[in-house]
């Protein structure tokens, strides 16, 4: 299926969707947003990744920052924090550059790796967009986490790619219907920037205070 540009979803929504389908719908369908420490810190982390300019050359390494990407087959568009192109004999040609180059996307994140987060899906989605745009194969990339200050290498396996496709298909269907799903509450709700908007609607105002108190009590 080929999506029209006006039907493209935001690639960054994969992370929201993996964390919580309801959070994704509140942000991307109902257009609601609220800041907390985590979202503010995350924005600052991305700003640092972009602040050195749009491109940089270091020998056989070309670094592009804030690179817009899209995929008509997936129906998404977004922006890569950093894409590193390393000169290699079996790479692809780049306009204005001599030689052949292999793309390697790098996504910057606050904190440290959490397997429940959608970071892997978001990074893999970026790679799939780049593959479609550049007519190439990208086998791996990396997530950079601000707390340990190091990279986590990521292989874009077929299993991970299929998870991206499945998530985007469900996201497109929910968006088409304009439907905000209900979900079971959990301790992770307490870390969500939208809890004050979401929980009163989801649970009824009388039970929200008790839920938050229980969640805080159970936190380490």
Question: Could you describe each region identified by the protein language model?
Answer:
Residues 11, 22-23, 161, 168, ...:
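Alpha-helix initiation and N-capping motif
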Residues 20, 180-220:
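Cysteine-cluster motifs in flexible loop/terminal segments that predominantly coordinate metals
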Residues 17, 28, 163, 167-170, ...:
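Residues that form generic nucleotide/phosphate-binding pockets
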């Amino acid at each position: 299926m080929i999506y029209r540009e006006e039907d493209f979803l935001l690639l960054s929504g994969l992370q929201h969707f993996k964390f919580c389908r309801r959070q994704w719908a509140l942000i991307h369908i109902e257009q609601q947003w609220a800041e907390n420490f985590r979202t503010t810190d995350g924005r600052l982390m991305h700003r640092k990744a972009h602040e050195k300019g749009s491109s940089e050359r270091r020998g056989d390494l070309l670094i592009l920052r804030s690179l817009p990407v899209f995929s008509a087959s997936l129906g998404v568009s977004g922006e890569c924090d950093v894409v590193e192109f390393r000169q290699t004999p079996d790479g692809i040609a780049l306009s204005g550059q001599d030689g052949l180059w292999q793309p390697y996307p790098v996504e910057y994140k606050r904190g440290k790796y959490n397997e429940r987060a959608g970071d892997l899906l978001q990074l893999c989605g970026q790679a799939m967009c780049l593959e479609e745009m550049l007519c190439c194969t990208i086998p791996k990339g990396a997530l950079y986490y601000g707390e340990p200050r190091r990279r986590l290498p990521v292989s874009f396996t077929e299993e991970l790619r299929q998870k991206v496709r499945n998530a985007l298909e469900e996201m497109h269907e929910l968006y088409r219907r304009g439907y905000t799903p209900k979900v079971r509450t959990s301790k992770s709700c307490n870390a969500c920037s939208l809890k004050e908007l979401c929980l009163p609607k989801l649970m009824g105002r009388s039970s929200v205070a008790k839920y938050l108190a229980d969640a805080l009590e159970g936190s380490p």
